[in-house]
Amino acid sequence: SRKNRGKQFSVLFSISSLLSIIAPVLAGFLMAKWGFSLVTVVAMIISIASMVPFLFLPKTKETLAWTYGETFRYFFHPFNRRMVGAYMADGAVGIVNGVFWPLFLFFLLDGKYNAMGMITGAILLAGLVIRLIVGNFLDKFEKLKLVRIGTILNSSAWLIKTIVVSALHVFLASLYHTIAIIVLRTSLDTLVYEKAADRGHYIDEYTLIKEMSIHFGKILILVLIAGMLFFFPLQVTFIIAAVFTLFVNLLK
């Protein structure tokens, strides 16, 4: 329901996060004992197993109202410019968070896999508890205002990460960033869901534009960072993420 949608999203995200708490701890232990090879094999097995349920899903045929040409025309249309810009920024920040922050941790902790796994697991566990608490609280406020607050918190979290120099700093900065992400993601995803429901038509088409925007953002940030890392340390990616995060505010 619209009234409890923030709480509902928090519960869904928390359920999906349960395995992600155990995974880094287990992966850290396996890498410390047997190296990357075993972890790679385990990851392959899990990935293949996760595809099995799709074999039992009923077949559905969805047709889009737009052609390829029309899709790109709507993608670049001035009317959708703010939405496209916001999702491109979201995709760009996702790359920094998923690729360059873990890479930074690897160098900072000097390949101490057990420590990396334990810290990551602790952060995810704290995030799960906080998400369940905050989700119910977020329903009391206007989603768009919370998105604005969430982008500011996330931007500041990225700037804080530029001064991280120890495992304790990693935990504290990541904990703060986890709270910021919960405020932003729960509010943003709830807002997007409500907008799609209110629109009532062209839902698949606008979902396609959203996904295109996110992936264009990923490509943009990778090209930008590839050039900048020749001249600046890895922490420059966090500054870029702090700037890009603010562009999520383009979403109305």
Positions of predicted regions on the chain:
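Helix-to-loop junctions at the C-terminal end of transmembrane segments
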Residues: 31, 129-143, 229
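Transmembrane alpha-helix termini and helix-breaking/packing motifs in multi-pass membrane transporters
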Residues: 22-40, 103-108, 219-244
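Pair of pore-lining "gating" transmembrane helices in MFS-fold secondary transporters
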Residues: 76-104, 172-179
